[in-house]
């Protein structure tokens, strides 16, 4: 559950931000979030539905001055759910399923907004060891 993940080149990444309602804390959403993530992992993983891997992040309150262009550098409490899929179509099929929709509805009760955006993977890398040649983009 807390081990490293491997993302194949060409994977589709979905970035979902869930803004928590005022007064809702991480402890309040933890069970609903865990149940929702388990449904995705166990029901749609691999050949069952195209789910590759996922990560959940809690906003720490940190906003980078160096990486932010806007004058106002603040953000509301939110959770980021990052999932990796073989295709956008497989993602959409999984989320149209009644079991997932019920779990997502329970999570949505505690949120004021949710936005899920899809991305194509363009680059990935890790620090190179001495003597190691740079990896080439697969053809």
What are these regions (language model features)?
Residues 1-101, 110-139:
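Short S/T/G/P-rich N-terminal loop/turn motif that feeds into the first structured element of a domain
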């Amino acid at each position: 559950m807390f081990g490293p993940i491997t993302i194949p080149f060409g994977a589709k990444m979905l970035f979902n931000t869930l803004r928590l309602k005022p007064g809702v804390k991480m402890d309040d959403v933890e069970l609903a979030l865990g149940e929702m993530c388990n449904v995705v992992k166990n029901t749609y993983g691999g050949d069952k539905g195209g789910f590759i891997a996922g990560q959940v992040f809690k906003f720490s309150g940190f906003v980078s001055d160096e990486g932010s262009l806007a004058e106002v550098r603040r953000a509301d409490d939110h959770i980021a759910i990052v999932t990796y899929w073989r295709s956008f179509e497989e993602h959409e099929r999984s989320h149209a399923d009644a079991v997932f929709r019920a779990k997502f509805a329970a999570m949505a009760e505690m949120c004021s907004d949710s936005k899920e955006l899809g991305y194509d993977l363009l680059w990935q890398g890790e620090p190179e060891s001495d003597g190691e040649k740079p990896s080439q983009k697969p053809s």
